[in-house]
Design a protein with these regions (language model features):
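C-terminal, low-ordered peptide segments at domain boundaries
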Residues: 2-87
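C-terminal "post-core" interaction segments
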Residues: 54-62, 66-89, 97-238
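P-loop NTPase catalytic core of nucleic-acid-dependent motor ATPases
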Residues: 92
Length: 238
């Protein structure tokens, strides 16, 4: 869709009619009206008790589907809920999270790492040899105006549920935390996208070509084949 035509499909109240064909070949008409909807990619946040050999552990579960700024307040509320409930373990469900804002990914990783990672490397941004002067390090911080809420107290490791749809900013969080705490992956192998882009505009056209890679505090990156799970479990959601 050309940029000049975007208002035709993004303005609220626009009515569009579609003819679609089902798997059986039968056609039917659909009418859709555009509207504004509140967005949040936090679909579930809860705390449950898990029996252990030492007794019972309070485990927080967070299903997070996209790194968008609109989810900031919901993430903040979720972490407040986890702390109030006394959660000491976290299951972070990124099965369907294909990425999004690197700034928000840094905020989430910083909240998980807490004071032990504050000021440490979140991502070492590397351009090619012709643009090495643009390289920079993005540090962990709990004071960036994004996700200023509480860190999860007492967290020493994190369990992440993954799938082939786990990509980009999701993998960035996994890779960033690994130098500082155990990150246990459960599910499927992730997508494998250790690269990013900075949009460039030329002659009225904006290009989003890949132009940098990301490394963690140990210089680890280039996970083009994705991260393999520590415990492989097939997704039972069709």
């Amino acid at each position: 869709i050309a940029q000049g035509q975007l208002p035709a499909v993004t303005s609220p109240g626009v009515i569009r009619r579609f003819t679609v064909a089902g798997a059986d070949g039968q056609q039917r008409d659909l009418v859709a009206t555009s509207a504004n909807f509140p967005l949040s990619s936090v679909s579930h946040a809860t705390v449950f008790d898990v029996p252990t050999v030492q007794g019972t552990a309070r485990v927080a579960y967070l299903a997070y589907h996209e790194f968008i700024i609109a989810s900031e307040s919901d993430l903040d509320r979720a972490f407040q809920q986890f702390n109030s409930a006394g959660a000491t373990e976290l299951v972070l469900d990124l099965r369907y999270n294909g990425g999004g804002s690197v700034v928000l990914a840094r905020g989430l990783a910083s909240m998980l790492g807490g004071t032990r990672t504050d000021g440490k490397t979140f991502a070492d941004i590397r351009f090619n040899s012709r643009n090495a002067d643009r390289d920079f390090v993005l540090p962990m911080t709990t004071n960036i105006g994004i996700l200023p809420g509480p860190v999860l107290r007492g967290l020493t490791r994190v369990f992440v549920i993954t799938s082939p749809s786990t990509a980009s900013a999701s993998e960035l969080v996994i890779n960033a935390l690994r130098p500082f705490m155990p990150v246990v992956l459960v599910g499927g192998t992730t997508f494998g996208k250790p690269y990013g882009f900075q949009p460039r505009t030329s002659c009225g056209v904006t290009y989003s070509a890949v132009n940098f890679e990301t490394l963690n505090a140990l210089g680890q990156g280039r996970y083009e084949s994705g991260f393999s799970p520590d415990c492989e479990v097939p997704d039972d959601l069709d």
